[in-house]
Swiss-Prot record:
Name of the protein in its database record: Long-chain-fatty-acid--AMP ligase FadD26
GO terms of molecular function: acid-thiol ligase activity; adenylyltransferase activity; ATP binding; ligase activity
Annotated organism of origin: Mycobacterium tuberculosis (strain ATCC 25618 / H37Rv)
Keyword Disulfide bond: no
Database matches in CDD domains: FAAL
Any single GO CC term annotated in Swiss-Prot or TrEMBL for this entry: plasma membrane
Use in biotech settings: Vaccination with the fadD26 mutant protects against progressive tuberculosis more efficiently than does Bacille Calmette-Guerin (BCG). It suggests that inactivation of DIM synthesis can increase the immunogenicity of live vaccines, and increase their ability to protect against tuberculosis, indicating that fadD26 mutant could be a potential vaccine candidate. A double unmarked sigE fadD26 mutant is more attenuated and more protective than BCG and is also a promising new prime TB vaccine candidate.
Length: 583
């Protein structure tokens, strides 16, 4: 599909010209009203207010300078982000600092990006201002409270260049396996990736349904930013937004919003589907119907097959179609979207021989009773944009052989901010002896392990997280899925080296149950036996140590991904407070 040199500001002006009175973004605030207070902006309002913010930013710096957005979830966040782009600045979307403690991640990102301004709101300006420090001799960033600007006064719109085809924003990675780095996302990347995802999710563009985007995802994360702000703009859709906290407090709100938004599309990580199943009652769904939900993307973290099944079964009585669930693979370095099953297909799984998988071969299980690992299909990706490559030789792997997923195309971003060496290593890979139809390069090395089997993409996990025990490869996501089917909570499977080899250690979050200390210990012993047996049976592995900890003990990133390297460090320093010390 062709990608033009259009920019996000040019699209925003086009929406304001062509659909001035159409609702663009609606934010539902459950904090001020448990039933939800809705506040909306039309496309003309979004455009005029973004221009006013851009005019204010012109006083702070020049196009190409960075502007950090540290605001609560809401319409002000949308306006701040689009205002930064309208001025030709490079936006840096971030979360507001954690209250009461120093937010090291916010400090590190601000030091790395060196913004000339910080866009925030009056409700959090006191916390945000503490981070507006000078770095490397540069002036401290100007703090602008977006909600205190006169955004409604009629005025002549300032003239801005609409041809900002370079960097649009820096998407700082969550850092599950390394220090966070700023991914440079261009205007072309955004438009190309949203367009690509629309083709992937709906097939024929002429058949793309009109409708509403529904999202509670944080606007500072790649999936939340693209889904909540960029996709509605590029695809001419209305957005219905709420805060992550509103979802976490009452997951049923997500399902209720999906049921009352007409034809709608949404997305969430795997854990959200699990929460919706467990914490949405029949009373919550009384009188509601999900037949108009055209798609719910499951992405951002490993998709558990059992969770998908539970979600479909739970909401089938409310007419949710199985074809609405869209397993998707992507990453910030490719803007967001890379692959998904074809439109109209229900989620498909294949059970692979586990012993063969540990040897790097994907062989579907037969009827011989071999132990299998069930993986979900991410569809048949375009061979010109996705290849499976041997990470050591840089030679493309044949079908059925596990390797690193490489990605090519207009959606691949510009690299890492101020990290030329890392950019060259990750973004400038070239295939050795490429097939006639394969581009030699540049290819993005995703760091993810996958395989093409029967033309479809299956994903195992991160290369850096791979567990090598007794000379065989084991995938921590698979082991964690086995544990979670028993315990229901978060689990981390890590490899801890001893004098000879690596040993499997499982860290499991578990809520203590029992009225007496004896009952608690009996339950913990039972869980340990059940988990140890399940891992041995499903993965042919011996657990060297199984650590039961309280919920919230496992280190995670801001997007909820397990920081396995931090788990290893904490375990080796005896930093986990074990529930099972007497077990």
């Amino acid at each position: 599909m062709p990608v033009t040199d259009r920019s996000v500001p040019s699209l925003l002006q086009e929406r304001a010209d062509q659909q001035p009175d159409s609702t663009a973004y609606t934010y539902i605030d459950y904090g001020s009203d448990p039933k939800g207070f809705a506040d909306s902006l039309t496309w003309s309002q979004v455009y005029s207010r973004a221009c006013i913010i851009a005019e204010e930013l012109k006083l702070c710096g020049l196009p190409g300078d960075r502007v950090a957005v540290l605001a609560p979830q809401g319409l002000e966040y949308v306006l701040a982000f689009l205002g930064a782009l309208q001025a030709g600045f490079i936006a840096v979307p971030l979360s507001t600092p954690q209250y009461g403690i120093h937010d090291d991640r916010v400090s590190a990102v601000l030091q790395d990006s060196k913004p000339v301004a910080i866009l925030t709101t009056s409700s959090v300006v006191g916390d945000v201002t503490k981070y507006a420090a000078s770095h490397d001799g540069q002036p401290a960033p100007v703090v602008v409270e977006v909600d205190l600007l006169d955004l409604d006064s009629p005025r002549q719109m300032p003239a801005f260049s609409r041809q900002h085809t370079g960097a649009a924003y820096l998407q700082y990675t969550s850092g599950s396996t390394r220090t966070p780095a700023g991914v440079i996302v261009s205007h072309t990347n955004v438009i190309a990736n949203v367009t690509q995802s629309m083709y992937g999710y709906f097939g024929d563009p002429a058949k793309i349904p009109t409708g509403t985007v529904v999202s509670w995802l944080p606007l500072y994360h790649d999936m939340g930013l693209i889904l909540g702000i960029c996709a509605p703009l590029v695809a001419r859709r209305r957005a219905m937004l709420m805060s992550p906290m509103s979802f976490l407090r009452r997951p049923a709100r997500w399902m209720q919003l999906l049921a009352t938004s007409g034809r709608c599309f949404s997305a969430a990580p795997n854990f959200a589907f699990e929460l919706a199943v467990r914490r949405t009652s029949d009373q919550d769904m009384a009188g509601l119907d999900l037949r108009d939900v055209v798609g719910i993307v499951s992405g951002s973290e490993r998709i558990h097959v059992a969770t998908v099944r539970r979600f479909i079964e739970r909401f089938a009585p409310y007419n949710l179609s199985p074809t609405a669930i869209r397993p998707s693979y992507g990453l910030a370095e490719a803007t967001l979207y890379v692959a998904a099953p074809e439109a109209g297909a229900a989620p498909k799984t294949v059970r692979f021989d586990y012993e063969q998988l540990t040897a790097g071969q994907a062989r579907p299980c037969g009827t011989d009773g071999s132990v299998g690992t069930e993986l979900i299909s991410y569809g048949s990706p375009d061979p010109s944009s996705v290849r499976i490559v041997n990470p050591e030789t840089m030679v493309e792997n044949p079908p059925g052989v596990v390797g690193e997923i490489w990605v090519h195309g207009d959606h691949v971003t510009m690299g890492y901010w101020q990290k030329p060496k890392q950019t060259a290593q990750v973004f400038d890979a070239k295939l050795v002896d490429p097939a006639p139809a394969a581009p030699e390069g540049p290819w993005l090395r995703t760091g993810d392990l996958g395989v093409i089997s029967d033309g479809e993409l299956f994903i195992m996990g991160r290369i850096k997280d791979l567990l090598i025990v007794d000379g065989r490869n084991h995938y921590p996501d698979d082991i964690e899925a086995t544990i979670q089917e028993i315990t229901g909570g978060r689990a981390a499977a890590i490899a801890v080296p001893d004098d000879i080899t690596e040993q499997l250690v499982a860290i499991i979050e578990f809520k203590r149950r029992g009225s007496t200390a004896e009952e608690v210990m009996l339950k913990l012993r039972s869980v340990k036996r059940e988990v140890t047996s399940a891992i041995s049976k499903s993965h042919s592995l011996r657990v060297a140590d199984l650590v039961l900890v309280s919920p919230g003990s496992i280190p995670i990133t801001t997007s909820g991904k397990i920081r396995r390297s931090a788990c290893v460090e904490r375990y080796r320093s005896d930093g986990f407070k074990r529930l099972d010390v007497a077990v």
